[in-house]
Amino acid sequence: MCVNSCVAFVGPFLELDACPECDEPRFNVHHQTHTNKHIPRVVFHTIPIGPQLQALWRHPESTEKMCYRVKKMQEVFDQLLKNDGLVDSYDDIFCSSAYINRVVDGTIQLEDMLLMISIDGAQLFKSKESDCWIYIWVILELLPDHRYKKKHILPGVIIPGPKKPKFIESFLFLGLHHFSALQCEGLTIWDSGCRREFISRLFLFLACADGPGLLTMSSLVGHQGKVGCCMQCPLKGCQKPGTSQYYPVLLKPNNYDVSGCTHADINVYSINSSM
């Protein structure tokens, strides 16, 4: 990867010898000159999800935990039949119509596995610049009380800093390419509880992040841009005078006259995709 965390040299950047953003050399020039070997200056780490999931099925105790979704699904369908299409309470994502519809139409099968991906940056030390970016896998097959616990979270990638990645897609490429292959071909699982082998397909059910993380993943302008949410609503922000920051305020500020931001007050009930 680039020493300034710009890109990972994978996919379309695989054959490059220098960063396309900052032009820093990819390989250690000293080693290359004296040993004729291509030694990367910096590396990042991708942990494939497939082997991690296979390991969870190799012990009867963890195998039992991985059966939560199937049990919950049966419970939800019993409630739907009893309550004329309604569930008793919406206490998990498996009560959602998005999930139920995919089960009904056969897209999601009993032996498949649903996952959530989440990406975020972390400052490792308080007194120095030391950003590190990671993405994790949350296994939705587990109970809600278990799936978010540290011991059940699976690492996906670790991107060393100190700077923020500029082409985050390049760092996600290897892990998601592996994930895509498992979606197409299936993942062979040994169920130690039932002592059987089966093929499971993976589903990326949710992709989550905080504000900066979502901005990095989506490549959009972010909440401080002029049109912070250009996909769902066209609400324009008001620029803070003398800065490049915009704020999505509904009421026009008093004594405010900034070019391009002089639109009238906006009724919150009028905000929609056709605004």
PLM feature spans:
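Domain-level detector for long, ordered catalytic/regulatory cores in large eukaryotic signaling
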Residues: 15, 25-95, 99, 172, ...
